Regions:
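Active-site C-terminal subdomain of aminotransferase-like
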Residues: 1-89, 94
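Flexible glycine/proline-rich, aromatic-decorated loop/lid segments
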Residues: 1-6, 19-23, 98-126
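Functionally constrained cores in energy, signaling, and assembly domains
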Residues: 61-63, 70, 75, 104, ...
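Glycine-rich beta-alpha junction loops
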Residues: 68-69, 77, 110-112, 137
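Active-site lining segments that contact anionic ligands and/or coordinate catalytic metals
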Residues: 66-70, 91-93, 99-102, 125-130
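PLP-dependent enzyme catalytic core of the Aspartate aminotransferase-like
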Residues: 35, 99, 111-183
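Structured loops at beta-to-helix junctions and adjacent beta-edge loops in soluble globular domains
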Residues: 74-76, 107, 134
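Acidic/polar loop patches that form or flank catalytic/metal-binding clefts of enzymes
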Residues: 40-41, 62-64, 102-107, 160-161
Length: 183
């Protein structure tokens, strides 16, 4: 163990650093410090709210009040024409990526996984798509693009009649690696 720790120090940092090198720990410290500054927090919350308000203006169903890191699209209201067992939130997330190159994540039936005994899907009350906004990365012009893309998808939502079927899934935590096929 002692001989191996020498190499650990050279390649990953000190053995008590949890596998993080000094550069990464420094970046983490900067991020933690920034996240306590009022101006940063105000700017961050305003950017998320900017996107949320645009979506509300366009009639796109979102969860309110807006948070400080993400906007949550309400897939049950966005695409009610897609049956729940065809993963409507996942279908919406895929459509957003295909149409606009915008990545979101399904927070719904896929994430809720199957009942461990019956292996049937568990259907949560909410079917959401989370649009997490990375910090210090995007401008309000990017947020306007996201909003316009979602408006276009929402305006053509009546064309969405079917969703997806899972063709491969892990026995637990399927949402990380499941594979889907369009119905």
């Amino acid at each position: 163990f002692k001989k191996a720790t020498v190499f650990n120090i050279m390649f990953e940092g000190f053995i008590t650093y949890g596998g993080m090198n000094g550069r990464d720990m420094g970046a983490l410290a900067v991020g933690l410090n920034e996240s306590t500054e009022f101006n940063y927090l105000e700017s961050r919350i305003e950017q998320v709210a900017f996107l949320g308000k645009k979506l509300v203006e366009y009639g796109v169903p979102v969860q309110q009040p807006f948070g400080g890191h993400a906007i949550f699209l309400d897939a049950n209201k966005f695409v009610p024409s897609i049956p729940r067992d065809e993963y409507r939130a996942q279908a919406l997330a895929i459509e957003l990526y295909v149409v606009g190159g915008i990545r979101g994540v399904e927070i719904g039936t896929v994430l809720a996984d199957r009942d461990p005994f019956t292996r049937k899907n568990r259907y949560p009350e909410l079917e959401l798509v989370r649009l997490a906004i990375p910090r210090r990365t995007y401008t309000n012009n990017h947020m306007a693009y996201v909003a316009a893309t979602l408006k276009n998808i929402y305006d053509s939502r009546d064309e969405a009649k079917s969703g997806y079927v899972i063709v491969d899934e892990a026995p637990i935590m399927r949402h990380f690696t499941a594979k889907f096929s369009k119905i």
